[in-house]
From Swiss-Prot:
Gene name in the database record: wdr68
Organism: Dictyostelium discoideum (Social amoeba)
Family annotation (PROSITE patterns): WD_REPEATS_1, WD_REPEATS_2, WD_REPEATS_REGION
Name this protein carries in UniProt: DDB1- and CUL4-associated factor 7 homolog
Gene3D superfamilies to which the protein is assigned, alphabetical: YVTN repeat-like/Quinoprotein amine dehydrogenase
Repeat region (WD), residues: 62-104, 115-155, 158-197, 247-287
């Protein structure tokens, strides 16, 4: 039987958090997080049943406030515990049971340095050393955690205003963050006294998201608040975009570089479109996307599978779709 190219899962709630498991032995497993205006929210782990062609909820848990991000541990070969991280009021780590049918809270990480807890806006898990995880907060700080000890390795004031997103480069030393002050800043864990401003938006429009190209770590992508364009940056040439991707008709909500290719990136937007771009002709202007997919509603989120790079997941309203590209 030939596999379908699109599978859909309908959730009982609006989906915001979305992450594709990196484990090779769990190829069609994802985590989805709710966006409800109540205190009690939810995260479900869903798995495609390849016999019935349907997604099934295999386990899940209640979560205080909507999770700002969900992410599986980058562990393709199952060498580590089967962990899922979420952020919201705190950073939490959840462990899936060996039967795959249960998931429990493993640890709640709090920084003893701070007296109160400011909401965490995002985080990233280091692929080279999965004991490292970095969180960003609306209190202007970023924190690097050692998840094995449960301790903060370092906390730094990263921006002048709220920090909205954080991402590691390939390797264990470099990370970058974006925030409400309109800057993208790069840090080196070996020398946190200094940061490099890679880009600042004209008139300091907030930058909401960033994504680091793992195949060619010279390149980053970022998006501005309420903007239909995607900014591609080259860290060797700060302050001037290497390219601008202008095709979406409404605000871009998510960006993801291809896990297996240095020159492909996917972008999703309120215009209901998911676009894949080929950037191999840079520095020539990139006029049009390579592939276009039209969803039924504004696309809030995407996740590109690292274990099967020909699959991308998107979330719109209460629907999750996985698309073969």
């Amino acid at each position: 039987m030939e596999k379908k190219r699109i599978y859909t899962y309908n959730s009982p709630w609006v989906i915001y958090g979305l992450s594709w498991s990196s484990r090779v032995n769990r190829p069609f497993r994802l985590a989805i997080g709710s966006f409800l205006e109540d205190y009690t929210n939810r995260v479900d782990v869903i798995q495609l049943n390849e016999e019935t062609d349907q997604f099934e909820v295999v386990c899940g848990f209640e979560h205080p406030y909507p999770p700002t991000k969900c992410m599986w541990i980058p562990d393709k070969n199952s060498n580590r515990p089967d962990l899922l991280a979420t952020t919201g009021d705190y950073l939490r780590l959840w462990e899936v049971g060996s039967n795959q049918r249960s998931i429990k809270l493993k640890s709640l990480l709090t920084n003893v340095i701070s007296e109160f807890c400011a909401p965490l806006s995002s985080f990233d898990w280091n692929e080279t050393d999965p004991s490292l995880l970095a969180t960003s907060s609306i209190d202007t700080t970023c924190t690097i955690w050692n998840i094995e000890t449960g301790q903060a390795k370092t906390q730094l004031i990263a921006h002048d205003k709220e920090v909205f997103d954080i991402a590691f480069a390939r390797g264990t030393d470099l990370f970058a963050s974006v925030g409400a002050d309109g800057s993208l800043r790069m840090f080196d864990l070996r020398n946190l006294e200094h940061s490099t401003i890679i880009y600042e938006t004209p008139s300091f429009v907030p930058l909401l998201r960033l994504c680091w190209n793992k195949q060619d770590p010279n390149y980053l992508a970022t998006i501005q608040q309420d903007s239909p364009k995607v900014i591609i940056l080259d860290i060797r040439v700060p302050s001037v975009p290497a390219a601008e991707l202008v095709f979406h008709k409404s605000a871009v909500n998510g960006i993801s570089w291809a896990p297996h290719s240095s020159c492909h990136i996917c972008t999703v937007s309120d215009d209901k479109q998911a676009l894949i771009w080929d950037l191999s002709s840079m520095p020539k202007p990139i006029e049009d996307p390579l592939l276009t997919y039209n969803a039924l509603a504004e696309i809030n989120q995407l996740s590109w599978s690292s274990s099967q790079p020909d699959w991308i997941a998107i979330a719109f309203s209460s629907h999750l779709q996985i698309l073969k590209v």
